[in-house]
């Protein structure tokens, strides 16, 4: 949904400068790797860092009939930060889920492809756009934000979580 939230530039600056972003290590292939992005988790909507996000939670909950009760945010510092192909297991444990993602900041490619193989599709959401992965998207598709070394700007993704749809760690 293009231009879903107004004041995207101000919200981006507020989140970039006030959220306690963290780096995490991940064990894969018997090695430990630093995740190429930073994250912040708000398990309770009462704790979200900006009132506009609370308004977004309420609007999305009303619109989709899903109680969104937390946020998972990613900060991609530049084009070297990325996330590989994955499904959102933690926020979608049911067959049909609705996972909205608000994009803020620099435009980055967002790719999806069928889990059983096939060509990927590329989207380039702008700051303030809402990407909604609904239905069986988390069962039948994988998605990623690939590295783009030429990108210098920062991107934030705000993932709206629902404990009714998934189990949080």
Spans of model-derived segments:
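Non-heme Fe(II) oxygenase metal-center motifs and adjacent flexible, charged/small-residue loops
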Residues: 1-169
């Amino acid at each position: 949904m293009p231009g879903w939230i107004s004041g995207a530039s101000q919200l981006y600056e507020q989140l970039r400068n006030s959220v306690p972003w963290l780096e995490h290590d991940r064990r894969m292939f018997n090695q430990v790797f630093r995740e190429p992005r930073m994250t912040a988790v708000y398990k309770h909507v009462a704790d979200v860092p900006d009132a506009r996000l609370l308004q977004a939670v309420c609007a999305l909950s009303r619109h989709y009939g899903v109680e969104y009760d937390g946020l998972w945010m990613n900060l991609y510092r530049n084009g070297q930060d990325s996330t590989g192909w994955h499904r959102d297991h933690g926020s979608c444990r049911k067959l049909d889920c609705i996972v909205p993602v608000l994009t803020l900041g620099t435009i980055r490619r967002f790719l999806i492809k069928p889990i059983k193989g096939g060509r990927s599709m590329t989207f380039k959401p702008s700051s303030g756009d809402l990407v909604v992965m609904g239905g069986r998207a988390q069962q039948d598709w994988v998605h990623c934000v690939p590295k783009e070394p030429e990108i210098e700007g920062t991107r934030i993704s705000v993932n709206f979580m629902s404990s009714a749809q998934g189990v949080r760690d």
